[in-house]
Amino acid sequence: MSQWKNICKIDDILPATGVCALLGNEQVAIFRPYHSDQVFAISNIDPFFESSVLSRGLIAEHQGELWVASPLKKQRFRLSDGLCMEDEQFSVKHYEARVKDLSLIHI
């Protein structure tokens, strides 16, 4: 990515949770699955219901992959690329995310 944007501090996200942030006009769900500085970012919009809810979903691990389950009907989206586990015809946009200088999350 050519232009990284500061989003929030890593400490703004409790481990095993997500938050929603605005990146331009897009809602981005940012997840911190563990106590480490590993973060993932996908669209916050559930494509099945067109609702802004994915940041409030439950994070789970299945067969070595991290997923978030939508709080609505529990469809799971892979955090590494946004693919829907239940129906591969659906996916959400994935964003590159990193932690810079041990504190700031960049997308």
Which residues make up each language-model segment?
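N-terminal first-folded block
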Residues: 8-38
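Immediate flanking context of iron-sulfur cluster ligation sites
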Residues: 32-41, 56-68
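Short cysteine-rich clusters marking metal-coordination/redox-active sites
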Residues: 46, 70
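Short, non-ligating residues that shape and space the ligands of small metal-coordination modules
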Residues: 52-55, 79
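A structural signal for short hydrophobic beta-strand segments in well-ordered beta-sheet cores
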Residues: 21, 30, 59-60, 77, ...
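C-terminal structural segments of small proteins and small subunits
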Residues: 83-90, 94-96
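Conserved small/polar residues in nucleotide/adenosyl-binding loops
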Residues: 105-107
